[in-house]
Amino acid sequence: MDLYEYQARQMFKERGVPVLDYRLASTPDEAREGARELLAEGASLLVVKAQVKTGGRGKAGGVKLAHTADEAYEKAQAILGLNIKGHIVKKVMIASGADIAAEYYFSILLDRSNRRHLAMCSR
């Protein structure tokens, strides 16, 4: 499966896995409106994230924090159109932020040469 982050979140949500709320935006104005909604619902921190099917978004400038709707607009404006490893950012996800102590990456891959699934986790 080759999914954008927002698609994976939606699948988790539909199956009862708790996920932080988010909005999807194709323009800075949509990002500002989505941020306003999340802030009105109680979010105190927002994360504006490039939606591209590649890793390294944060290092490439595709993940930025915002505290206000206007900041979310500015961050979305900077991210939309960005080229991340050959992928042009056409959408951003504005998500409620969380206070995290540690971050992990988890993936299940198909190892075609051995005809098995491979679980990978890193910190």
Language-model segments: residues:
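ATP-grasp fold ATP-binding core
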Residues: 5-12, 41-58, 86-99, 106
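Short beta-strand-to-loop capping motifs
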Residues: 65-68, 96-100, 110
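Alpha-helical scaffold segments in soluble metabolic enzymes
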Residues: 10-14, 71-78, 105-108
